[in-house]
Amino acid sequence: MAVKRAPSKKVRAEQARRPKKNPLIAAGIETVDYKDVNLLRTFISDRGKIRSRRVTGLTPQQQRQVAVAVKNAREMALLPFTSR
């Protein structure tokens, strides 16, 4: 009688490596603006840190735009530096 086995580690690893959906492309946004605070909050952790590309699924260019926009929004007091 054949025993059903769980998928091998290699198969599970391939399934786990699916790229994340790019939230900026999904929303149709080409450039990130520091005044769009609701959008920027999606890229900030609950501790106030900018989330990494691996977490957000952004391209390198978009990640740089988001980082600059978040820093500008912090300087303009639209976003807090920390979240207490």
Swiss-Prot record:
Keywords: Ribonucleoprotein, Ribosomal protein, RNA-binding, rRNA-binding
Disordered: region residues: 1-20
Cellular-component GO terms for this entry: cytosolic small ribosomal subunit
Source organism, top-level taxon: Bacteria
Basic residues composition-biased segments: 1-10
GO MF assignments: small ribosomal subunit rRNA binding; structural constituent of ribosome
GO biological process: translation
Stored Pfam families: Ribosomal_S18 (PF01084)
Entry function: Binds as a heterodimer with protein bS6 to the central domain of the 16S rRNA, where it helps stabilize the platform of the 30S subunit.
Quaternary context: Part of the 30S ribosomal subunit. Forms a tight heterodimer with protein bS6.
HAMAP family xref list: Ribosomal_bS18
Protein family membership: Belongs to the bacterial ribosomal protein bS18 family.
NCBIfam families reported for this sequence: S18
Protein name (Swiss-Prot/TrEMBL): Small ribosomal subunit protein bS18B
